[in-house]
Amino acid sequence: MHKDSIRKLFFYYFIPLVFSMISLSTYSMVDGMFVGKKLGKEAIAAVNIAWPIFPGLIAYELLFGFGAASIVGYFLGQNKTHRARLVFSSVFYFVALSAFILSMALLPFSETIARFFGSNDALLSMSKRYIEIILMGSVFMVLHPLADVFVVNDKRPVLAMVAMLIGSLANIFFNYWFIFVLEVGVQGSAIATVIGHAIGVLVLMQHFWLKKGQLYFIKRFSLSSVISSAKSGVPQSTAEFSASIMILLFNTAIMHTAGERFVSMYGIVMYNAIIFFTTLFAISQGIQPIASFSYGARNLERVRAVFVFGLKAAFCIGIVFYGVYYFLDEFLIKLYLQPSEQDPLFMQETKRAMNIYYVGYVFLGMTLLCAVFFQSIQRTKSSFIITLSHTLGFIIVLLPILSHFYGINGIWVTYPIAQFLAFLVALGVTYYEIKKGVFTTYKEQNLVILKT
């Protein structure tokens, strides 16, 4: 990793990452497609109401996983492999146990959670059943991306991709089996999702059990490793948790402003946005191990080059993806609708919503890149400021104002306006960090890890 070109290293990580993350994202997309095609728009609305539980679970994983991955990459760059194993093992043990305990504690409150997410009486039964199944299998849904990020940092991105693809294919098969063959309703989609993640975890675990890389389990536990990882992972965890709150806010605003029909519409917009967002996030994740390793090795010129390359990639890919989505909007919408539900007015309104909403993703790609980059080199405060701005910072202010004065149109324009403002914040933070010498002065990180 010291000598290879940044472009070569980026694509070495990015290509498997984008395939693995798109495979992960298709869990939700496949749920929406099968539910919509078999059960209709009301079922899509019910599943969309339950959707915030997914960012919530991923936020919990990122709180420990992304921070631990940055620290592990930092230690590997310094050739301190046993410390890297201590961080990996401690975080994995803690997350597995705590995720199981938390999910079992929340299970009796499934109906309360569904109502909190904005479900009305018509959607409550389906939303509740979906949430119950997801909670029962949530430990696999947390461990899958956690194991994935450690495998990537252990220089096995192809294995991470294969695990995600296998799990995704299993999810597709079982979605079809439970919904179309057994006809068990929306809970069948939830069961398929859990099974897919469980299979993905099993594929990844053999890498650690068989000690195929530098990272494997050791019989030690360090609470300070967990705490340091959590501190380092706060920005990305906040981003994902805020995404859960954002979906809740949009669902609530749309339900009050325009009703269930437009909640279904927003569900389709968000399902189709998954691959767009995932690709942008994969760009950021692709530079993370390179930036962390280079910073640990004190190669600041390489750190700067990684950042510049990542920004260019995020901008170009964002523009290309927006163009693809703009010209394929009608085709993408029909993926989630029964033929009888594809009325011209609904289609036209959904296309308009997509074309407005997705402008925000062009800015989001570069903002995400800045947030993940600063997190990768342990600039947690800067990363947190950027993260807060692109998640809830502006949305929570703009959404009630614009929805009040402009109705549903105000809701759609909220997202791109908020992301443009967040991008300006990211530029300001980057300027501040450059003035502080982020690319010219190495700062030894005070990572509180048990000495080995």
Label each PLM-derived region with a short phrase.
Residues 1-14, 72-139, 183-234, 291-359, ...:
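Short alpha-helical transmembrane segments in multi-pass integral membrane proteins
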Residues 2-39, 55-66, 71, 96-103, ...:
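N-terminal transmembrane alpha-helices
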Residues 12-31, 133, 167, 196-200, ...:
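Transmembrane helical elements of multi-pass membrane transporters/channels
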Residues 26-45, 114-121, 177-184, 244-271, ...:
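Helix-terminus/linker motif at the lipid-water interface of multi-pass membrane proteins
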Residues 44-104, 141-160, 265-327, 364-383:
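Small-residue-rich hydrophobic transmembrane alpha-helices
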Residues 56-59, 171-175, 200-205, 274-278, ...:
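Hydrophobic transmembrane alpha-helices of multi-pass small-molecule transporters
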Residues 106, 149, 175, 179, ...:
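Structural signal for membrane-spanning alpha-helices in multi-pass inner-membrane proteins
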Residues 133-152, 163-171, 189-202, 284, ...:
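Short runs within selected transmembrane alpha-helices of multi-pass transporters and secretion channels
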